[in-house]
């Protein structure tokens, strides 16, 4: 036996490493059907198992990051379809498969049907965003299409009761698994549309295997959802479960509870928002009222300086002065006339002309009459002018307003009360009428709606 001149010599570890790279790079991803045996789950959370058929077997490993996405419980003896890459466990030189996904064997056929229907409906535009309907911001009534005995219904009702206990709910019970479930779901959606009593629908169920959820991948359900006039939220299984119904629905919720969150208002949050807005409104109103109060006080000060009563008092005083001056003038004139009469009488008495005296007496009487008439007319005119001035002033006088049945109410400090917010229970207030004042105690204060 002869050796080549330059043979390539491997160590065992080097050989295993190159074989591993060769398997991983050349073979790539493979799909494999087989029966589970020797399944073990150590504390690390990884799965170690053997896949076999009637003639051969292969060791497999499925690490924790991948096996947490498996939605069924693997068991020895169960037929499965796995997606894996070939590798080699170098320390022992064991050829093995690193499994990336696993599903029951029948799920492979179902997955193929799923992909074909998905492509067909997508080509028709049933998944397009332009075909989606907007969800109402504040639904008036929510319809739930699911099993009447399933956990999904309990979860949805629990969330709706917590967030918006007054929201009306209509339940359209239906099968959500097994033969005939797809037809019942489509009929329930059609019934909800024909009754037109809800403005949003939740269609869904809890988690399960691909076979359990298959009714939501049926074409009849997809087309019924697409044709619905009422917006539909799909809520099928868990977040990792994706169905044809999710693509066709107007909105997809990862879980039934999440769907209930989507379609309901958070009443407590809204109440907090209303309370915040109320506080802001009250603060703004207080600032506005404070500003108006300052403006009112300034106006009141200006009005008091120009009050009609003050003007009336000034005019009345002026009229009194004019009247006094008039009376003095008349008195002086009378005195002068009286003096003249006395002087003429003296002269007449000295001259003793009877006829002249008689004539002068008549003339004097005439002058006296005319003077008195003039005085009466002048006095009447002055009184008339005084009455007109008083009448004009009376039209703007607060006393005239009081005479018409109005009143003015002051607090204990003498400030005018214009609002029920300016008084407290037990305050003493004074109300002025045209003929006097009334003092009273506040026992009730209410605002007009």
Swiss-Prot record:
One record GO biological process: DNA catabolic process
Protein's job: Bidirectionally degrades single-stranded DNA into large acid-insoluble oligonucleotides, which are then degraded further into small acid-soluble oligonucleotides.
Protein name: Exodeoxyribonuclease 7 large subunit
Organism of this sequence: Aliivibrio fischeri (strain ATCC 700601 / ES114)
GO MF: exodeoxyribonuclease VII activity; nucleic acid binding
The keyword Nuclease appears for this protein: yes
Record family assignment: Belongs to the XseA family.
Reaction catalysis annotation: Exonucleolytic cleavage in either 5'- to 3'- or 3'- to 5'-direction to yield nucleoside 5'-phosphates
Keywords assigned: Cytoplasm, Exonuclease, Hydrolase, Nuclease
Keyword Cytoplasm: yes
Compartments, as annotated in UniProt: Cytoplasm
GO CC annotation terms, alphabetical: cytoplasm; exodeoxyribonuclease VII complex
Organism placement in taxonomy: Bacteria, Pseudomonadati, Pseudomonadota, Gammaproteobacteria, Vibrionales
Assembly information from the UniProt record: Heterooligomer composed of large and small subunits.
Enzyme type, top EC level: hydrolase
Pfam families named in the record: Exonuc_VII_L, tRNA_anti_2
EC number: 3.1.11.6
């Amino acid at each position: 036996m002869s050796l080549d001149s330059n043979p390539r010599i491997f160590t065992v570890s080097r050989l295993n490493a190159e074989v591993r790279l060769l398997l991983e790079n050349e073979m790539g991803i493979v799909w494999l059907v087989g029966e589970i045996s020797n399944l073990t789950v150590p504390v690390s959370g990884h799965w170690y198992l053997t896949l076999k058929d009637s003639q051969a077997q292969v060791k497999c490993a499925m690490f924790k990051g991948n096996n947490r996405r498996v939605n069924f419980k693997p068991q020895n003896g169960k037929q499965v379809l796995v997606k894996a890459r070939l590798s080699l466990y170098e320390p022992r030189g064991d050829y093995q498969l690193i499994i990336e996904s696993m599903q029951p064997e029948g799920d492979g056929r179902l997955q193929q049907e799923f992909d074909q229907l998905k492509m067909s409906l997508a080509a028709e535009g049933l998944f397009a965003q332009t075909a989606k309907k907007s969800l109402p911001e504040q639904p008036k009534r929510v319809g739930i299409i699911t099993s009447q005995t399933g956990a999904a219904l309990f979860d949805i009702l629990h969330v709706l009761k917590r967030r918006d206990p007054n929201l009306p709910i209509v339940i359209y019970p239906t099968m959500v698994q097994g033969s005939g479930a797809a037809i019942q779901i489509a009929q329930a959606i059609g019934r909800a549309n024909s009754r037109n009593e809800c403005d949003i629908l939740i269609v869904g169920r809890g988690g399960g295997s691909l076979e359990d959820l298959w009714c939501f991948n049926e074409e009849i359900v997809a087309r019924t959802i697409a044709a619905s006039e009422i917006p539909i939220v799909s809520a099928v299984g868990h977040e990792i479960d994706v169905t044809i119904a999710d693509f066709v629905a107007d909105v997809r919720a990862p879980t039934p509870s999440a769907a209930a969150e989507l379609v309901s208002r958070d009443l407590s949050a809204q109440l907090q928002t209303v309370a915040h807005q109320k506080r802001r409104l009250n603060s703004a109103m207080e600032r506005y009222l404070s500003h108006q109060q300052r403006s009112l006080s300034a106006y009141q000060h200006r009005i008091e300086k120009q009050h009609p009563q003050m003007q009336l008092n000034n005019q009345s005083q002026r009229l009194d002065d004019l009247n006094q001056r008039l009376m003095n003038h008349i008195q002086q004139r009378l005195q002068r006339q009286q003096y003249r009469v006395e002087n003429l009488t003296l002269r007449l008495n000295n001259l003793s002309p009877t006829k002249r005296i008689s004539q002068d007496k008549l003339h004097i009487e005439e002058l006296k009459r005319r003077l008195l008439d003039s005085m009466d007319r002048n006095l009447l005119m002055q009184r008339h002018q005084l009455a007109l001035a008083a009448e004009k002033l009376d039209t703007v006088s607060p006393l005239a307003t009081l005479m018409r049945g109005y009143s003015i109410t002051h607090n204990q400090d003498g400030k005018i009360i214009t609002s029920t917010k300016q008084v407290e229970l037990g305050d003493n207030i004074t109300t002025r009428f045209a003929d006097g004042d009334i003092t009273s105690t506040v026992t009730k204060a209410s605002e007009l709606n």
